[in-house]
Amino acid sequence: MAVKVWLITAILVGFGLTACTSESNELLIENVVIVSAERETAPDAMNVLIRDGVIAEISAEPIQADRSVMRIEGDGRFLTPGLMDSHHHVAFVPGMGAIGVAPARDHEALVDAYMAQQPRSLLYYGVTQILDPAPLLAWRDFAANSPGPDLFRCGEIPNGEAGYPINQRDDADMVSLYPYRITSTRTPEMVVERIAADGAICVKIYLEDGFGAESEWPLYDAEILGRIRDAARAHELPLLAHANAIDMYQIALDADVDVLAHGLWNWQWPEGDPPVAEILQRVHEQGVGYMPTHRVMAGLGEHLLPARMDAPEYADIVPADLLDWYRAGGADWFADELAADFPPDMPREEMAAIFGYGVGRVQRATAFLEQAGHPLLLASDCPGSPTSANQPGLCTRLEIESLAQAGVSPESVFRAGTINPARQFGLEARYGTVEVGKVANLLLLEANPRLDIAAWDTIQTVILHGEPLARDDLKAR
C-alpha cells in the first residue's frame, strides 16, 4: 500500500498537484491569478478552495486546510472559468452524420470509439459545458461517459415531416427521433410543456425554407411561431432559431426570438444590395443572442481538401481507428456529395475556396456586431454537417480563431465562452465566473486569454467539478 500511495503522489506532483493519503472532497489551488469576467483586472496571486465540486473560498491570504486536502501549486498561472460551447451536437459523428442512421449505423465500433472520446476531446480544449440545441436521443449516451462536460440541451421543434430537418432524413425511424413535433393532437403549448418537463433549458425552432437560393420547404406561420414563443416564455425557456439567411433572420426577429443559432452567411436577396447592416442592427437593438458558428461553412470547405485529416492536431483527439477510416476515404462520400454541386472538372481546392466566401460573409456580420458592442456566444455547431474536419473541442478552438480573424477582441472571445452563455441561458448562478458558490469547472493556463487567444493553447489542467485532470490524459488513446 505504501508503494501505491507513493506512486500516486509522484504522478500528482508531476503536474503541480500534491496530496496526502486520506481521502478528501476538497481541492486547494494556491498562488493563481484569477481571470474572470466580474474582475476588471487580474489580481495578485490568489488562493481558491473547492469543496464538493463548488468554489468555497477565495482569498489573497493563505487558506488553512487539512493535510488531507489535495493541493495545486499555481505558481502564478492563470485560473479561468471553463469554456461553454453553446452549439455542439453530441448525436452526430463527423464524417458520418446522425447516430443510428446510415452510414453511422454501419460502423458501430467506430461510433462507440467516437462517443467514448468525444467528451474527453471537448475537455482537452477546455470546454467544460456544452449546449446541444438538437440532441436527438444519443445525449443519454454522451451523459453516461465520464469525465465529460456538463451537458445542457434544447427541445427542438421540427417543421413537420415535410419541413426541415426531418426532410433531410430518409430513414423510416427518423420521425421517432423528433419527439417534440406539433401535430393535429399536440399543440405548440403541449409540446413546449413537454420540453420543459423533460429538463431542457431552451426551445429550438427551424427557420429554413431551403439551402442557398432554394425556398420550397414549409415553415410555421407567424401565429404558430408566436404561440411557441409565448409558451417558451411561460416556462422561462429561451427560444432559439436556426436561421442563417437574411429573410429567415427577418422572420426570427419579427417573431421576437431570444437567440439566433447561426451567423448570417446567406446574403441571397432578390434584387439590389442585401440589407445586411439593417438586419444586424435589428439584432443588436432587440438584444438577440448571436451564435456566429463560423465553422459550419469552414468545415464544409475543409472537407473537400484531400489531406485535411493529416493535420497533427487530429491525432490528439480522434480515435486511431476512426482516423484511419477518414484517411482511407471513409468520409469521402460527403465530399463527393458536396462536389456534385460544382462543375465536374473543377479542382476540389477551388470548391473549398468558394465555401470560403461564406466564411468571409459571416465574419463580416460578426465584426459588425462586435463593433456595436453586442455580446456574442461561443458556438461552433460541431460538426454542423457530416464534415470530418469539425472534431469536438478542436472545432471550438478553430471557432475562436475565426472570431479573432473577424476582429473580435480576446476580451470579447473570453466573455463569449464564459459569462455571456451563462447569462443567456439562466446559468449565471452556477457558471460563467470564478466566484464563491459557482461550480468548480475551471482551467489552469500558462497565459491570460483576456489578452491573447493563443492562451487557450496553454491549458495545463482542466478542473471538472473540483476534480483536476491533466490535459495530456484526455488525449485519444
Feature locations, PLM:
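Active-site mouth loops of central-metabolism enzymes
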Residues: 100-113, 169-189, 238
